[in-house]
Design a protein with these regions (language model features):
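Active-site alpha/beta core segments
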Residues: 151, 157-159
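Catalytic beta/alpha-barrel core
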Residues: 57-59, 84-90, 111-116, 134-144, ...
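A ubiquitous, low-specificity "background" feature that marks scattered single residues
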Residues: 65, 145-146
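N-terminal capping/lid subdomain adjacent to the active-site entrance of alpha/beta enzymes
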Residues: 1-109, 117, 124, 128-132, ...
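Active-site phosphate/pyrophosphate- and oxyanion-stabilizing loops and adjacent acidic/basic residues
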Residues: 98, 151, 174
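Short, structured coil segments at secondary-structure junctions
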Residues: 156-157, 180-181
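Catalytic cores of alpha/beta
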Residues: 118-128, 148, 168-180
Length: 185
């Protein structure tokens, strides 16, 4: 009662980090599996929805190690793509989200999580490419330590932008608020 009491009888949850599979896929392989094929994204979204989820969070920015140049693999410690995308990386990421949208239809909300891996121009290009898929929000497409970079992305793509887990003080958020760059914190 002191802090206002209960305000919501229910809270919405989303199925998170589907790029690592979902229950049926994990049980089948007995481990987390990083998904590369868009068909697998279709399947895991269907599985999550069968469990009652109407929103999912996906990071589509991964590539098999054998496709990464060795210098890039050493610099990124694995499958994550950092910085600039090659054209086929962009296409593959969009295909994964397209498969999720196809699986979920218009009633599914899709959150695209990038874990701050991309540079500003690549994040803007990917955001533009994802616009037709009705993305709920585009989370941390690049590092939030320079709010001007988020402003650059916001000016170039129409997706709602989100950040917050890597900004820690009111000063870390101040410029975002002043520029009205963020849609979700």
């Amino acid at each position: 009662k002191l802090i206002g009491g209960k305000t919501n009888k229910k809270l919405r949850a989303y199925a998170s980090q589907l790029q690592f599979g979902w229950r049926t896929l994990i049980e089948k392989n007995d481990a987390l599996t990083l998904l590369y094929d868009p068909k697998d994204y279709y399947d895991v979204v269907k599985d999550a929805m069968a469990e009652g989820y109407d929103a999912v969070k996906i990071d589509p920015v991964f590539a098999p190690l054998e496709e990464r140049p060795m210098a890039e693999v050493m610099a990124t410690q694995g499958n994550q793509i950092r910085g600039c995308y090659r054209e086929h990386d962009l296409t593959r990421s969009v295909e994964r989200i397209a498969a999720a949208r196809e699986a979920g239809g218009p009633d599914l909300d899709i959150i695209v999580e990038i874990h701050s891996l991309l540079d500003a121009n690549t994040a803007a290009l990917l955001g533009q490419a994802l616009e037709p898929y009705r993305i709920m929000y585009y989370e941390e497409p690049t590092m939030p330590c320079n709010p001007g970079v988020f402003k650059h992305i916001k000016e170039r793509c129409k997706l709602p932008l989100a950040t917050g887990e890597r900004s820690y003080t009111r000063w870390g958020f101040r410029q975002f608020f002043e520029d009205r760059t963020l849609d979700i914190i």
